């Protein structure tokens, strides 16, 4: 029985979509894999490690619209002819983080539903790519970021990781800080998003540290909260 369960687990964790414009280097689709890789995925450690002259140019943009409500991930693969492949992944209506830590092998049948990314794909023309890259440039999206900026899981924020012509870049934007005043690219990117889940727009909320999850028992309201901290050229190690 243990061998069967182990094989089932391996099959579940090994499922990787091959329908994207170009295959991403990390699989963050399945919930257990995402719980292990999510922070390094947002930090784009894979992109940074492979960023060198002569390599492929690509960007990863993460829109965290309150972790438990919605997250949208955009992978942009720039092509030599000026076009680009855009892969879109959306997580919506996620359960509290405590559920991830409580998953057991016997619950394999339950982990592939609401936790799976809904996916979309677009091929952008050279003109569309030019407009998008221009809006990113106007947003200072290629860095440097504000050192020490905090990104709580239950806030609205963006991160942009990039490798362009072998040059690494990183930027982050936190909605409560400046109401996304410097984010010039969001509407352009959302216009390319063909996943049939409405974008969770930023809204004014009380400070993240004061908010509680009513579904958690008393004393556990903040136990599963997490926060990312921006460094001089990327996310600080957790």
Where are these regions (language model features)?
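Positively charged n-region of N-terminal signal peptides that target proteins for export
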Residues: 1-4
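Function-determining sites in protein domains
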Residues: 22-238
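Bacterial N-terminal signal peptides
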Residues: 6-15
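Sec/Tat signal peptide C-region and signal peptidase I cleavage site
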Residues: 17-21
């Amino acid at each position: 029985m243990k061998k069967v369960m182990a094989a089932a687990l391996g099959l579940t964790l090994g499922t990787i979509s091959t329908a994207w414009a170009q295959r991403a280097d990390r699989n963050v689709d399945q919930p257990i894999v995402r719980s292990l890789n999510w922070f390094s995925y947002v930090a784009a450690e894979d992109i940074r490690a492979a960023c060198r002259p002569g390599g492929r140019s690509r960007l990863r943009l993460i829109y965290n619209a309150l972790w438990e409500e919605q997250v949208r991930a955009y992978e942009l693969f720039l092509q030599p002819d000026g076009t680009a492949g855009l892969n879109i992944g959306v997580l919506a209506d996620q359960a509290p983080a405590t559920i991830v830590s409580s998953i057991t092998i016997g619950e394999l049948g339950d982990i592939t539903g609401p936790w799976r990314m809904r996916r979309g794909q677009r091929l952008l023309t050279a003109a569309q790519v030019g407009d998008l890259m221009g809006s990113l440039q106007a947003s200072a999206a290629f860095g440097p970021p504000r050192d020490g900026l905090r990104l709580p899981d239950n806030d609205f924020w963006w991160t942009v990781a990039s490798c362009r012509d072998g040059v690494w870049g990183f930027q982050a934007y936190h909605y409560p800080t400046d109401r996304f005043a410097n984010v010039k690219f969001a509407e352009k990117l959302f216009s390319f998003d063909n996943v049939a889940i409405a974008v969770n727009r930023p809204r004014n909320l009380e400070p993240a540290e004061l908010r509680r999850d009513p579904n958690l028992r008393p004393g556990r309201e903040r136990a599963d909260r997490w926060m990312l901290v921006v460094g001089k050229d990327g996310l600080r190690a957790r």
